[in-house]
Regions:
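Non-catalytic, conformational "gating/processing" segments within enzyme and secreted inhibitor domains
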Residues: 1-2, 18
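Accessory "access/gating" subregions that flank catalytic or transport cores
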Residues: 1, 8-13, 27-124
């Protein structure tokens, strides 16, 4: 809770809405990762810190469902592009598609942070 609160305070200086919620979710996950290795449980911890009606919560639920449906992250990436692609959000670097890639990479990376980094850094080359 403290990590999410600090992230909210810091993010609120220059952002609002989904960007703040994304920061809270990741901060909570990161702080809990010192004692928990299961990504699904870490995601639950992060989601508990953001509002139920947040776009980030909806995005996380969709990515979890696609992760359960598809063994290959490329298929999940296609769903992200169709539902949360950069063409659907304005700005140079919108948090929604970027956060989707982070969550996808963490879920498909499993217990390998190296694999997660490979996925998240490879995915953008498959352009939305």
């Amino acid at each position: 809770e403290r990590a999410a609160d600090l992230a909210r305070r810091a993010a609120s200086v220059s952002h609002d809405g989904g960007a703040v919620h994304a920061a809270q979710l990741l901060a909570a996950m990161e702080s809990q990762a010192f004692v928990e290795r299961d990504v699904q449980r870490l995601l639950d911890v992060g989601l508990a810190q953001i509002p139920r009606r947040s776009i980030i919560r909806r995005l996380a639920a969709d990515i979890r469902a696609w992760h359960a449906r598809y063994d290959d992250w490329h298929a999940c990436y296609g769903e992200i592009a169709a539902h949360y692609g950069y063409d659907k959000y304005t700005g140079n670097c919108h948090v929604v598609p970027n956060h989707a890639l982070i969550l996808m990479a963490l879920l498909y990376g499993g217990d390998s942070f190296q694999r997660a980094l490979t996925i998240v850094n490879t995915a953008p080359s498959f352009r939305f």
